[in-house]
Amino acid sequence: MSLDQNIAIKNKLNKNIIFYISIFIIGAVAYYLSIINEDPTVFPKSITDEFKFTAWINAGEDYLKDNYRWITRLFASFLQAGYMALENFFVESPWILIMSLMALPALAYGGIKLALFCMFTVYFWGAVDMWEVSMQTLALMGLSVILSVIFGVILGILSSQSDRFENFLKPILDTMQVMPAFVYLFPAMFFFGIGGAPAILATLIYAMPPIIRLTNLGIRQVSKETIESAESFGSNKFQLLFKIKIPMALPSIMMGVNQTIMMALALVVLATFI
C-alpha cells in the first residue's frame, strides 16, 4: 500500500472519529436537557429565553428597512420601469401582432402544431375577455425569464471556471430551490414595495437555479479530448470558452432555459398577487 493511500485512510478515519464524537456529544447534551426540564415535550425555556432568535431577526429587518430601503427602492424603480414599458407595449399593441410574435417562433422551432396551439391560446385570451391581465402576466413572465437567463448563464459560466465559486454557489442554489416562495415573497414586498419589482425578484430567485446548474454542467461536460485538440491549435482560454465550450454546451443550456421558463411560470401566478 502506497504512502498516499495510507494518508487517505488515516484522514478518513480521523473524520469518522470526529463525526461520531460530535454525534455522541450532541446526543448527550439533548438527553441532559430532556432530564432537567420538567416537561420533556417542551424545549427548556432557560435556553429559548436567552436565544431570542425572532427578536434578532425583527431587529435586523427594522434596521435594514430604516437605513437601506432607499437602495432597494431605487433598484425596484428600474425593474418597475422595465416591467411597465414591456406591459404597455403588449397592452397597446394590436392583438394580431402579439399572435404573430407568439406563433412565428413556435413555427420556426416547434412546427405547425405548436404554432397553431400558440395562436389558439392568444385567441382564447381575447375570447374570454382576459386580454389585459394576460398581457400583464406575459410582461412579468417575459422580463423575469430574460433576466433569469442573462444572470443565470453568466453565473453558470463563472461557476464552470472555478471550483471554489461552484462550491460557494451550491448551497445558495439549494436554498433557493427548496425554500417556499412565501418566505422571500413577503420580504421582497416589504423592501421593494407593491408592484412588478418584488414579483420579478421573487421569480428570479425561484427560476434561476436550473439555468445556473445546467450551464455549469454543460460546460464542464465538454470532453477533454476536444479541449486538448483546441489547445493544440493554439486556442487561448477565451477562445476555448466562447468558441468551443459554450457552443458544445448549448443543448444543456437550452434545457436550462426550458426549466427556467417552467419554474417562472409556476411562480408568476402567485407573484401577481403583489
PLM feature segments, named:
Residues 102-108, 118-132, 144-173:
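Transmembrane-helix boundary motif in ABC transporter permease subunits
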Residues 201, 205, 237-271:
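Transmembrane alpha-helices
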Residues 179, 191-192, 204-208, 215-219, ...:
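Hydrophobic/aromatic residues within the transmembrane alpha-helices of Major Facilitator Superfamily
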Residues 127-138, 152, 212-219:
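Juxtamembrane membrane-interface segments at transmembrane alpha-helix termini
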Residues 80-91, 131-143, 166-169, 173-176, ...:
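Alpha-helical membrane-interface segments at transmembrane helix boundaries
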Residues 1-139:
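N-terminal, non-cleaved signal-anchor transmembrane helix
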Residues 140-143, 147-160, 170-207:
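Generic hydrophobic transmembrane alpha-helix motif, especially the helices
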Residues 176-179, 219-223, 229-249:
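Short helix-to-coil transition segments within interhelical loops
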